[in-house]
């Protein structure tokens, strides 16, 4: 029977998912693992959209006083009755997600942080009338509710103290996306001020806090301990390199197969794996949950839908562009190897500060790994990490960013672009060949590997389109229907009514002349100029272009 449960697209509240009949992949084993591997302060680092917030929401629902036992019925953790009796619903919980702390100025971001803290205070509004609190405590709490600046650094510690007075229990502190304020501060130029604020906030809450039971933090980066966790000796970091908890963030093969089968979509497993699997956390191979849930949700309505770039489209992916912008010859070569499925070997830094990210290429490789753009494929004998692109979605992202970089850098040299485009009108094949070849040598290409010929042609096709697009008054059509087939590129130059046909071929065996001849023959057989004639063009120029690796050949039809 096909599952009728709704899919939780974009929902990261455990309680909402369980109460409202959404499909839930059981990750409550995380609770048991946490309690069996005790740590007073635990930081989980995982890429974005890997279920961090949902898991933290689950921990809140489990530990918080007044916990609803029914939320966990039928789940893994409910089988461990002894553990549930000892810990479920036993602690006051302070739950903060810092993903919304941003602003163009430090004052704006600080104000936003104050609002988030005040909202969490408001969730414990009962403290305002608690008999266990003194009048001084209540006055302080009322002041904290306003979110005023001077209370920020001590606010979490003070709230845990007030909760202890009321409940007689130490607090569980959960801070989700702890590093977002630092990331935004780095982007907007107030990094040092934000580091000072967060260091003070965390130092009070996590280091010198007698009212802390245990704390859980999540983030994408393991920010240097010396940066914001100074002196925190009770600190345990569980990164994507750690085998502990390796299946608790992300979906496993079996979980994805079960999900697809539940909705009658088992036949779509191969493409789901090709596009969204490939991440190696510890000893586990996992899929990106955001991708899988979105894809299954779309398949549920239309089984012909193709996989999409859900994860990569949920962010600007600036880190990939920064790598490409800074790439020297060696780095370009390494990016090319990654795109065709090879591994590169790197020494990675596990602890960075945001202001170190751009200091060298090595730091950028480390961040790409930590944030999910690259994954681990083992180690070398000397301890280097073998890095690879995890799946088809991320490969597409790299290619997209390379094209954007090529377009932007090419546009900076308008004189050269003008010369290149005019060479097509002047029938100057030598100039076209020379300049196109130079562009190919300066970009990052797809190598001659098992990649399908059509994919290689698409790469060169995209570069050529980007270059010709410099001419704002030229009408350029890609893969336009013409005659009895589709031509690669049609160009209409209105001011002299000239139509240009370009057929591009990839010379898989390296024979550029033969590939050009094939292109010209195809143009004659398919009557590609018909569409240009219909559009009023009177003069016609036909080019066959062949590419192999970073070489090209250009011929013109007689």
Predicted regions and their residues:
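Phosphate-binding site recognition
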Residues: 1-456, 471-473
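Structural signature of nuclease core domains in nucleic-acid processing machines
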Residues: 429-558
């Amino acid at each position: 029977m096909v599952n009728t449960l709704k899919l939780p697209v974009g929902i990261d509240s455990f309680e909402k998912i369980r109460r409202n009949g959404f499909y839930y992949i059981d990750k409550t084993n995380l609770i048991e693992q946490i309690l069996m591997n005790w740590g007073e302060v635990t930081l989980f680092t995982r890429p974005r959209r890997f279920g961090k917030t949902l898991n933290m929401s689950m921990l809140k629902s489990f530990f918080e006083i007044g916990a609803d036992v029914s939320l966990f019925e039928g789940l893994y953790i409910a089988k461990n009755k002894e553990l549930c009796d000892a810990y479920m619903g036993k602690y006051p919980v302070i739950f903060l997600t810092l993903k919304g702390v941003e602003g163009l100025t430090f004052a704006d971001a600080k104000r936003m942080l104050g609002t988030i803290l005040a909202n969490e205070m408001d969730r414990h509004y009962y403290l305002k009338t608690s008999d266990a609190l003194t009048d001084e405590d209540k006055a302080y709490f009322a002041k904290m509710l306003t979110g005023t600046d001077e209370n920020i650094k001590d606010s979490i510690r003070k709230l845990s103290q007030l909760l202890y007075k009321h409940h007689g229990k130490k607090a569980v502190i959960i801070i989700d996306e702890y590093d977002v304020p630092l990331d935004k501060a780095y982007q907007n130029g107030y990094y040092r001020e934000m580091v000072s604020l967060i260091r003070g906030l965390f130092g009070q809450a996590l280091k010198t806090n007698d009212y802390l039971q245990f704390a859980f933090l999540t983030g994408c980066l393991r920010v240097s301990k010396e940066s914001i966790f100074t002196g925190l000796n009770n600190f345990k970091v569980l990164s994507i390199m750690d085998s502990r908890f390796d299946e608790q963030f992300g979906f496993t093969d079996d979980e994805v197969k079960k999900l697809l089968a539940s909705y009658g979509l088992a036949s779509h497993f191969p493409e789901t794996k090709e596009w969204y699997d490939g991440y190696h956390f510890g000893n586990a191979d996992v899929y990106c949950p955001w991708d899988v849930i979105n894809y299954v949700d779309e398949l549920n309505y239309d089984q012909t839908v193709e996989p999409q770039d859900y994860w990569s489209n949920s962010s600007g992916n600036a880190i990939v562009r920064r790598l490409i912008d800074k790439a020297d010859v060696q780095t370009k070569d390494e990016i090319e190897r990654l795109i065709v499925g090879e591994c590169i070997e790197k020494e990675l830094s596990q602890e960075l500060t945001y202001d170190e990210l751009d200091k060298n290429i090595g730091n950028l490789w480390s961040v790409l790994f930590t944030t999910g753009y690259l994954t681990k494929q083992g180690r070398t004998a000397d301890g280097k990490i073998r890095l690879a692109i995890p799946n088809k979605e991320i490969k597409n992202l790299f290619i997209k960013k390379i094209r954007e970089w090529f377009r932007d850098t090419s546009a900076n040299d308008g004189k050269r672009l003008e010369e290149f485009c005019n060479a097509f009108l002047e029938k100057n094949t030598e100039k076209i060949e020379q300049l196109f070849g130079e562009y190919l040598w300066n970009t990052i290409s797809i190598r001659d590997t098992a990649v399908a010929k059509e994919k290689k042609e698409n790469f060169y096709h995209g570069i050529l389109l980007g270059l010709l697009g410099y001419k704002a008054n030229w009408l350029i059509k890609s893969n336009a229907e013409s005659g009895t087939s589709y031509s690669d590129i049609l160009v209409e130059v209105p001011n002299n009514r000239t139509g240009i046909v370009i057929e591009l071929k990839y010379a898989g065996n390296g024979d550029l002349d033969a590939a050009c001849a094939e292109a010209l023959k195809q143009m004659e057989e398919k009557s590609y100029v018909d569409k240009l004639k219909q559009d009023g063009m009177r003069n016609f120029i036909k080019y066959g272009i062949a590419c192999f690796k970073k070489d090209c050949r250009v011929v013109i039809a007689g």
